[in-house]
């Protein structure tokens, strides 16, 4: 069975401005889409299928990050930010952070460590640090509440397992390594000094984020009672670490190391 749900706000063209290369998505679009598609798919299955569903996994297009509060709640889910595009997910194809990406590249080339070494040697305006630096730089209002950021592929597993606090989220190695300049070689994310040299408003973010990352064969947890009820599934359903769609396509195609 398969199901499709068009994002209602996206279909209305909300929060996007093609003239500025701005493409934002409200987190409610994702929540509503998840509920609708799972229920629709189950409705197409024989009776008794739901108790036999044992796992859920997510792949998303990235980098699609969002600023969160201390509880890991995307800022757009708070009443005061509900209509602020800078408090929403910054879609992968949003290119409002071209300037910040250029600054990251210039900074990385003169830093002691080239944090773009495993990013293809050049950082993109489509990626998380450029986007978060841009949003914080242009919008003082979101700075008051912003505590951390999270990728779309990490937020959905965290949401439905009840593990949303930034320090306890299982972060995708796929997303962190490719977009956030994370590497075991230099101890995780770029240093606080590097990040604040890029944008002083990034101060403190690194300590609220992560050192460890996980691959998608790792279990984040199981559905919370609330989400089991919302999806029509059981609390025994396992949820895996998320990843990016293009990378998971390679897995599906059975691409293996040489």
Give the location of each predicted region.
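Short alpha-helix plus adjacent loop in nuclease-associated cores
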Residues: 86-105
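Gly/Ser/Thr-rich active-site cleft segment
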Residues: 68, 95, 105-244
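Short, hydrophobic/amphipathic alpha-helical packing segments
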Residues: 31-42, 129-132, 153, 244-248
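N-terminal glycine/serine-rich phosphate-binding loop of ATP-dependent small-molecule kinases
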Residues: 1-77, 204-207, 229, 233-238
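Short glycine-aspartate micro-motif
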Residues: 52-59, 90, 149, 236-243, ...
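Short beta-strand-loop/turn "lid" adjacent to the catalytic site in phosphate-handling enzymes
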Residues: 21, 43-90, 118-126, 157, ...
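Conserved phosphate/anionic-ligand binding catalytic regions in large, soluble enzymes, centered on
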Residues: 174, 241-258
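Short beta-strand scaffold segments in enzyme catalytic cores
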Residues: 1, 64-68, 179-180, 248-252
């Amino acid at each position: 069975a398969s199901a499709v749900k068009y994002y209602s706000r996206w279909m209305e063209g909300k929060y996007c401005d093609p003239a500025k290369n701005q493409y934002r998505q409200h987190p409610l679009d994702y929540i509503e889409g998840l509920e609708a598609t799972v229920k629709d798919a189950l409705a197409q299955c024989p009776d008794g299928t739901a108790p036999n569903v044992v796992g859920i996994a997510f792949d998303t297009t990235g980098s699609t990050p969002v600023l969160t509060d201390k509880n890991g709640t995307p800022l757009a889910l708070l009443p005061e930010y509900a209509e602020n595009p800078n408090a929403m997910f910054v879609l992968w194809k949003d290119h409002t952070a071209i300037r910040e990406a250029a600054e990251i590249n210039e900074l990385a080339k003169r830093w002691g460590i080239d944090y773009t070494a495993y990013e293809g040697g050049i950082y993109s305006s489509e990626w998380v640090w450029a986007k978060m630096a841009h949003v914080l730089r242009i919008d003082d209002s979101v700075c008051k509440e912003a505590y951390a950021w999270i990728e779309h592929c990490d937020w959905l597993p965290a949401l439905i397992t009840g593990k949303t606090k930034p320090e306890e989220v299982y972060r995708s190695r796929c997303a962190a390594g490719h977009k956030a300049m994370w590497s075991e070689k230099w101890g995780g994310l770029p240093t606080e000094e590097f990040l604040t040299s890029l944008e002083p408003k990034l101060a403190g973010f690194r300590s609220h984020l992560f050192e460890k990352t996980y691959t998608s064969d790792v279990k984040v947890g199981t559905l919370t009672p609330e989400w089991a009820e919302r999806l029509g599934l059981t609390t025994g359903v396992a949820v895996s670490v998320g990843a990016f769609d293009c990378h998971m396509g390679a897995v599906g195609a059975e691409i293996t190391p040489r």
